From Swiss-Prot:
Annotated Pfam families: AAA_lid_4 (PF17864), RuvB_C (PF05491), RuvB_N (PF05496)
An example molecular function term from Gene Ontology annotations: four-way junction helicase activity
Keywords: ATP-binding, Cytoplasm, DNA damage, DNA recombination, DNA repair, DNA-binding, Hydrolase, Nucleotide-binding
CDD domains tied to this protein: AAA
Origin organism lineage: Bacteria, Thermotogati, Thermotogota, Thermotogae, Thermotogales
Protein name: Holliday junction branch migration complex subunit RuvB
Gene name per UniProt: ruvB
Quaternary organization: Homohexamer. Forms an RuvA(8)-RuvB(12)-Holliday junction (HJ) complex. HJ DNA is sandwiched between 2 RuvA tetramers; dsDNA enters through RuvA and exits via RuvB. An RuvB hexamer assembles on each DNA strand where it exits the tetramer. Each RuvB hexamer is contacted by two RuvA subunits (via domain III) on 2 adjacent RuvB subunits; this complex drives branch migration. In the full resolvosome a probable DNA-RuvA(4)-RuvB(12)-RuvC(2) complex forms which resolves the HJ.
Amino acid sequence: MEKINEYGSERIVSPERTGYDSYSLRPKFLSEYIGQENIKERLKLAIQASKMRGEQLDHILLAGPPGLGKTTLATIIANELNANIHVTSGPILEKQGDLAAILTNLEAGDVLFIDEIHRMNRNVEEILYSAMEDFQVDIMIGKGPAARSIRVELQPFTLIGATTRSGLLTSPLRNRFGMIFEMNFYTQEELKMIITRAAEVMGTLIDDDAALSIAKRSRGTPRIAIRLLKRVRDLSTVRGSENITLNIVEEVMRLLGVDEFGLDEMDRKILKTIIEIYKGGPVGLKSLAASLGITEDTISEVYEPFLVQSGFIARGARGRIATEKAYKYLGYNTLPGGLFDGFGNIE
């Protein structure tokens, strides 16, 4: 049968947010949030302590690959604090005035969430320094020789920043966060629980083996798990099935081109390129991106994290290397050092 993907050019297993992702399935409180146990425990303690002291919660940085629940966790923190949350993102804050307008309109106890904070303009970022430390901001009034700076006192607030590339944050900004959490990929058991809960919220029953099959293909990412569940539910509905079965899951995955490892055609293309064109590597990011016809950021932020985490690619000082697992996955023969002639034969 022909493979289908109703997302058009968007990958069904992309961890990036799409217009098809549903906010209604997200947990609202820490008690409903599955996974990231260490982070949850630390947050519970910090939130409880801030409430008992009547103080503002420390600023928080949430770091990790896309789709792991950074936005969801920021919303949960606001809910736990019974606070209003204001959402923006680094790329749209182009001028200092854009951020100053948001900061001066915050009320006491509010939460400001800045997604992709690493992409914020450096001039804009400087306004955050005094805002985070002293709850005040200097605003320039007028232009030219008549311009003057006035200091505006801000209401106490909590800033939550989210980043997929914490290494791009400047030290002055990073050092102003009281708590920094590195979010990890989810286990299959955690994803199975997330899928089962989401199916229940959707009003759908799902067999345990079916939920586990989806979890195995979800690349350690809840956003992908929910997206796959929705597509499986579609076929289940069309078939008139009372619950989602393993057979239905496997049929949908074949149609979507997602294998039992959660890899799709682009993942396989990346691995084949490293092995066939670059003899298994090492290959630099720039060269790999040029060969694949995609941007370096797309490789490093979207594809690589899972391929590295799952052991198909290793990264070193000289570049990316296809692992023995990648060779075996694609059915290639290898020598120590990864020599390969492109046709499954050893050179």
